[in-house]
Amino acid sequence: MKVHLINPSNVSFGTAVITPRWLYVLAAATPTFYGAPNLVDETLVRTDPLTIEPGDVVGIGIHTGNALRGYEIGRMARSRGAYVVFGGIHASLYPAEAAELGGAHAVVKGDGDLAWAHVLEDCSQGAPKPLYVGGRIEGSEFLPARWDLLPANRYMWASVQTVRGCPKHCSFCSVWRTDGQRPRQRSSDAVLEEIVDLRRRGFRFIALADDNFYPVTLTDLELASRQNNAARLSELKAIRDERFELMCRLAQLPADTVFFTQITMEAAEDPEFLTAMKAAHIHGALVGVESVTPEGLKDVYKDFNLAGQNLVERLRKFRRHDIHVLGSFIFGLPSDRPETFAATAAVAEQAELTFAQFVMLTPFPGTVDFARWEQTMQGDPTRIAGVPLTRGWLIPQAIRPKLFWTHPVMAADEIRRRTQEVWDRFYSIRVIWRRSRFLRSIKGRLAFVMISKLYRRMYADTGIATDSARVAWSTRWARWLAKPTRSLFAGRPMPDLQVPQPAELLS
């Protein structure tokens, strides 16, 4: 019985930006007596059906965006006599769909770290269960990924997870519902061992692939203190102390190490935390700005963010600590108006963001937005390729709409066009070159231009429908840029690098 793990993708670039962590974690969860699993990341290369034989087990991890491709692979694998198992956020939300459309014998709902071995045992006995509930395991149970199975020279960034869960409740995000609002944090020892393993292999750019690297805010501590909730305050301080211990040890890694993470904007009001991030080589962070207006922030349940000039000043605080921000903005909110687009572009430039992404509001399953939208769509007769809009991920990619939400004052095409104009403005050669001034050398600035253009080409898919010719052209363009760009991120292997010790052991 051969085990296959497949990460579906609609396009393959040959080179990928970041390692799909789940693939290598489940490889670690595969008992050794089954042998090393066959790993397929379709962002690199398409699945070869001929590798799948009767009696094999094929595990497919899906999110909403790649579910349709995942179902195609599942049906193919089942037709070849394999046991088909689905997991991931989307399969956890729609297990029956994976069985009906993807040929699933089984679905793992929730974390798969511990459940996967049980799935394989049942498949080996010819009796897989329809549903396995992995639940939410504790941080101490998170498995380190099997990075020894990585193909050489194919990824720009590696990925390590330090915490799962996010205490926020943004309306457009499913993380707090699927991963929970209680931070489940790995020990510093486990995180450092995995990072050192990657540095030994030549990765120096590593994403801390967390839902929120800043799980305890100063406001959280103040609130617990005002409420005289000693137990809650102690719990929060322990989580915060663990963050600082981790960053203190990350700071001992070689100086050319670069970490990138995801964080809420509230961290900008915590100079001690930002200082520790800088020392820990955390030089980049994705920050969900979402909207530049107070009304827009209320639309997405994110009114803990600031707006206007206050927003600009808060974002600049990251840069003052040498942390480069990838700002994420949403267009198409109910309160958005035509003038919102230019105002957002201006804020992105004034706030000294290094990168930015501008996405159109899409109601994803598992979110508050989706539940509200699905309710309003009851009885709507609209079908595309026979599929209702509320199951838009099942519409073939070539004709799938990019915007589903009806806006009170703007047509979908206007939102798409104005969104594209903001992408074009932020990623024009002139503006990118101006942003590159933080780099000292011409070579470095030219590399920054190339990386910026690659990011824009790979992620600025804002067409009202995904035209297959445009996708093919974009894929060729991105593939041409990806290989030379990957070399910019590569580091030299450090086989003798040791795991940094806690501060008390160094004194």
Residue locations for each model-derived region?
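Alpha-helical structural signal in soluble globular domains
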Residues: 29-33, 76, 80, 97, ...
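Residue-level signal for short, function-critical loop segments
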Residues: 9-11, 64, 212, 265, ...
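Radical SAM enzyme core and accessory elements
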Residues: 2-8, 36-39, 51, 99, ...
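Structural recognition of alpha->loop->beta junctions
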Residues: 97-118, 276-285, 343-358
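Acidic, low-complexity intrinsically disordered segments
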Residues: 1-203
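A structural preference for short, hydrophobic beta-strand core positions in alpha/beta folds
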Residues: 38-41, 86, 261, 327, ...
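Flexible glycine/acidic-rich beta-alpha junction loops that bind and position SAM and/or redox cofactors
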Residues: 95-97, 168, 205, 214-228, ...
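Radical SAM [4Fe-4S] cluster-binding motif and immediate context
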Residues: 143-326, 333, 338-342, 346
